[in-house]
Curated annotation (Swiss-Prot):
Residues at which S-adenosyl-L-methionine binds: 35, 37, 62, 83, 108, 133
Protein name: Ribosomal RNA small subunit methyltransferase A
Statement: the UniProt record of this protein carries the keyword S-adenosyl-L-methionine: yes
EC number: 2.1.1.182
Gene: rsmA
Signal peptide segment: none
SMART domains in the cross-refs: rADc
NCBIfam families named among the record's database cross-references: ksgA
Main location: cytoplasm
């Protein structure tokens, strides 16, 4: 039986967090990027943003001592929380002892066999959402690992460094726009839901965070001939942001007369000026460019 605890002190209440850490003699490891949230209003806002209810399973990454997990467990059908730090497993067993709908998996999410793990949900056919406070140092690898997996996650509501959230959700012709924006938005819509100040964490990080909501598209935003080549072209177009598209392309593909002739032909086919910068191209433009370059033999 799940015990609802809305009327009690929360794990995220500062006094409770401190008591839990003291009781277990826990010390933070910088290598794991550990910053524990101590604001219950923000935690409730995260759950509301993710629209968690009893018809949804949740995957959480980096539960810490269970502050967000507690809120998720009260609302979701089931929560599967991946925690890489062995020391936190007994703490989570303590703080979440009143919930029978939480599974703590002591494993690196990047190494987990997610296809097998999600079958461990009591009702694996329910939609799955990812809700997490992601470690700053490994945010992008985790996101891309999950997005590119064959698991149909319905949406992601994740906390990350504000700068990274801005880059992911950025539009063309902005300073934040780049290959990361394209890589995520190809698969998902992305929007910053709200900002989280650094002052509500223990220990406090050096920068503010943001909650990013990403919803999986039914189909990728565009259709391309070769996805790997499309992502490769988008990445190389931002290697030197101040350089023109032509300079970035020739730096990568080469500057022989044959290569330059193919690049000129490909750019003409895509109706893209060589003098433009990558940040001015939409995802659709990059799709046309990649297909055209593929067509001319690059």
């Amino acid at each position: 039986m799940i015990i609802k605890r809305r009327e009690y002190m929360r794990i995220a209440d500062y006094s409770v967090t401190k008591a839990v850490l003291d009781r277990h003699g826990f010390t933070f490891k910088k290598s794991f990027g550990q910053n524990f949230l101590t604001d219950t209003n923000i935690l409730q806002k995260i759950v509301d943003t993710a629209e968690i209810d009893q018809n949804v399973n949740v995957i959480e990454i980096g539960p810490g001592i269970g502050a967000l997990t507690e809120f998720l467990a009260e609302n979701a059908a089931e929560v599967m929380a991946f925690e890489i730090d062995d020391r936190l497993v007994p703490i989570l067993a303590d703080t979440l002892r009143d919930f029978d709908n939480v599974q703590v998996v002591n494993q690196d999410i990047l190494k987990a066999d997610l296809q097998t793990q999600i079958k461990q949900f009591k009702n694996p056919d329910l939609p799955i959402k990812v809700v997490a406070n992601l470690p700053y140092y490994i945010t992008t690898p985790i996101l891309m690992h999950l997005i590119e997996s064959k698991i149909p996650f319905q949406e992601f509501v994740v906390m990350m460094q504000r700068e990274v959230a801005d880059r992911i959700s950025a539009e063309p012709n902005t300073k934040a726009y780049g290959s990361l924006s394209i890589a995520v938005q190809y698969y998902m819509t992305a929007k910053v839901a709200f900002i989280v100040p650094r002052t509500v964490f223990v220990p406090a990080p050096n920068v503010d965070s943001a909650i990013l909501k990403m919803v999986r598209r039914d189909q990728p935003l565009i259709e391309v001939k070769d996805e790997d080549f499309f992502f490769r072209v988008s990445r190389l177009s931002f290697v030197h942001r101040r350089k023109t598209l032509w300079n970035n392309l020739t730096s990568h593909f080469g500057k022989s007369e044959d290569i330059k002739a193919k690049l000129e032909k490909g750019l003409a086919l895509a109706d893209i000026k060589p003098s433009i910068r990558g940040e001015a191209l939409s995802i659709q433009d990059f799709g046309k460019l990649a297909d055209a370059l593929k067509e001319v033999g690059l």
